[in-house]
Design a protein with these regions (language model features):
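Short, surface-exposed "cap/lid" segments of acyl-processing enzymes
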Residues: 90-98, 102-157
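Primarily recognizes the serine-hydrolase "nucleophile elbow" in alpha/beta-hydrolase
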Residues: 193-199, 203-262
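Accessory cap/linker subdomain of secreted extracellular hydrolases
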Residues: 47, 243-339
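Catalytic-loop region of hydrolases
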Residues: 29-108, 370
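Acidic catalytic loop of the alpha/beta-hydrolase fold
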Residues: 246, 352-357
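Short beta-strand/loop motif that positions the catalytic acidic residue
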Residues: 342, 347-354
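Alpha/beta-hydrolase active-site loop
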Residues: 178-198
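C-terminal catalytic histidine-bearing segment of alpha/beta-hydrolase fold enzymes
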Residues: 330-331, 363-364, 370-408
Length: 408
């Protein structure tokens, strides 16, 4: 074989391998996806790379192989891709967001696989708390893996699954805008666009789902979807125990004493996010003890924040300085409430034994959504807790039936 022929053959093999990495993509599209760096360098794109495309486009991607003790690739997926894609922060600045794209096994139906874009529950606010960075025994492992059975169930039913990390998780900057619904929601929609850059033959029909923080973020995503992804068909939103009424809850929690120290870490994640959003200097609002601990929110995950060496030994009524006013913070907390207008059907599932997202607040949210004209189905489950509403087989079956009805 001549040198010229060998060179041509090598080019063909290289192009074929690239195309095989991205099933359903043309050769030109496959070549346009930049090869991702290995290790944690995956999460570090330059400002130039981030600004080189529109929100919802891919910076780079790489395949993650399934292993029995792994956390990122799913057992029921034919392929899991780790993706870094473009989005915007709450102020409209271009940012990179990480996430995962899972394809089901088997041949795609006519029109392509329909899909679910998932918004996860609270793991923390540090970059290491991202689901895509999870490992067995990791700092947020138990806050992530409870939903794995749901992902596999959806894949087995024939749906592709997209799992954003959210801004500021995985990628270090910007700080994670915890419960800032527009930011979370945008990242949930943008990954649906990014997935279709990888796999253009995916169906345009998709659902948005989420739990807790993600239940709230998913509702915001549902309201944003028609504008952010007008060429796709968002067929509905299913939301497990969505966080809501943070302003009302903040007023109640701020007066709680030592018996409620276990709430302080979560309260501080919310307050820290609100201070960032409102551009309030912590020294004007919180006690010196609390201010000294704030950097920990960007260093460790929720499970560690609840420890006695951080927030676990501080009562909620010891967070704020005496006599401070919080008007700008209150405005942010009110804006976190997901009483949004969604044109597609909505399912809200709530465990009645939930002591994290209280059923009374969820019932109030459902009433607000219905008043706005949203088509809401509200299913409650006696005896189920905050995580139980996601993991319980009976509740899961109800939600899966709803999913199948929307994605027929």
């Amino acid at each position: 074989m001549s040198v010229k022929n060998r060179s041509v053959r090598l080019l063909i093999l290289t192009a074929s391998a690239t195309a095989m990495l991205l099933p359903g993509a043309s050769l030109a599209q496959a070549e346009a996806i930049k090869k991702a760096p290995a290790g944690n360098a995956f999460y570090k794109a330059s400002a130039k790379q981030i600004k080189a495309g529109k929100p919802g486009t891919i910076i780079w991607a790489r395949q993650v192989k399934y292993t029995a003790n792994g956390r990122v690739a799913l057992a029921s997926a034919s392929k899991t891709m780790l993706v870094l894609y473009r989005s915007l922060d709450p102020k409209g600045k271009p940012i990179a967001v990480s996430g995962m794209v899972d394809l089901p096994k088997g041949k795609a139906p006519k029109g392509g696989f329909k899909s679910i874009s998932w918004a996860h529950g609270t793991t923390g606010a540090a970059d290491i708390c991202a689901p895509s960075r999870d490992v067995a025994g990791g700092p947020a492992d138990s806050y992530i893996t409870y939903a794995t059975a749901s992902y596999n169930r959806w894949l087995k039913a024939g749906y592709a699954v997209f799992r954003t990390d959210y801004p500021g998780l995985g990628v270090k900057e910007p700080p994670h805008p915890y419960l800032i619904g527009v930011s979370e929601g945008r990242s949930v929609v943008d990954i649906t666009l990014a997935a279709r850059e990888l796999y253009p033959k995916l169906s345009k029909d998709y659902l948005i789902g989420g739990h807790s923080q993600g239940g709230q973020g998913g509702l915001f995503a549902g309201s944003l979807a028609p504008k952010l992804a007008p060429k796709l068909n968002m067929k509905g939103v299913f939301s497990y125990a969505p966080a809501s009424h943070l302003y009302e809850q903040g007023n109640a929690v701020s007066n709680l004493g030592d018996d409620f120290k276990g709430l302080t870490a979560l309260v501080m994640m919310i307050l820290n996010s609100a201070m960032h959003e409102a551009r309030v200097q912590p020294s004007t609002l919180v006690t010196p003890q609390i201010e000294a601990l704030l950097p920990k929110i960007e260093e460790v995950c929720l499970a560690q924040l609840t420890g006695d060496d951080i927030f676990g030994n501080i009562a909620p009524n010891a967070i704020l300085k005496p006599g401070v006013t919080t008007a700008s913070i209150d405005a942010v907390l009110k804006a976190m409430n997901p009483n949004v207008k969604i044109k597609a059907p909505v399912l809200i599932a709530q465990g009645l034994d939930d002591t994290t997202v209280f059923p009374s607040f969820t019932a109030a949210l459902v009433a607000e959504l219905k008043t706005s004209g949203d088509k809401v189905t509200y299913d409650t489950f006696p005896g189920l807790t905050h995580s139980g509403v996601v993991t319980d087989p009976a509740a899961s079956a109800v939600v899966l039936d709803w999913i199948k009805a929307r994605l027929r």
